[in-house]
Amino acid sequence: MSDPLGDMLTRIRNAQRARHAVCVAPASNLRANVLDVLKREGFIRGFSKEELRPGVAQLRIELKYNDGEPVIKEITRVSRPGRRVYSKIKELPRVYAGLGVSILSTPRGVMSDVEARTANVGGEVLCRVF
């Protein structure tokens, strides 16, 4: 798999379109950090890490719906393995005039665009969520 984060985002997108309550993806620290931001911003209900066997784990993602409609309307990968996208804090665009969130990987960890502006730090733009 050349883009593990992109794979997880696609699994979430497909599960929400199929109205599944839970989605499963292989575990990694980056994926868990991105899910933590999605939970803080209210896009998912929660997630947990399940150990399948020693050294192999998966993330169980609890998706969130509002009156039967998915909370996540759009989730897209911005920075890809073949084309990395970096942004300074002053050049960081707002997603749908602040209704959506960009998730960044910064020297201070993975955080939302709002948290990055508060911390005055830029970084790699991983994805956009609306």
UniProtKB/Swiss-Prot annotation:
Keyword Hydrolase tagged: no
Top-level taxon: Bacteria
Keyword annotations from UniProtKB, A to Z: Ribonucleoprotein, Ribosomal protein, RNA-binding, rRNA-binding
Keyword rRNA processing attached: no
GO cellular component: ribonucleoprotein complex; ribosome
PROSITE patterns: RIBOSOMAL_S8
SUPFAM superfamilies, A to Z: Ribosomal protein S8
InterPro entries: Ribosomal_uS8, Ribosomal_uS8_CS, Ribosomal_uS8_sf
Signal peptide (from-to): none
MF annotations from Gene Ontology: rRNA binding; structural constituent of ribosome
GO biological process: translation
NCBIfam families associated with the record: PRK00136.1
Subunit (UniProt): Part of the 30S ribosomal subunit. Contacts proteins S5 and S12.
Family affiliation: Belongs to the universal ribosomal protein uS8 family.
Function: One of the primary rRNA binding proteins, it binds directly to 16S rRNA central domain where it helps coordinate assembly of the platform of the 30S subunit.
Alphabetized PANTHER family for the sequence: 40S RIBOSOMAL PROTEIN S15A
Name of the protein: Small ribosomal subunit protein uS8
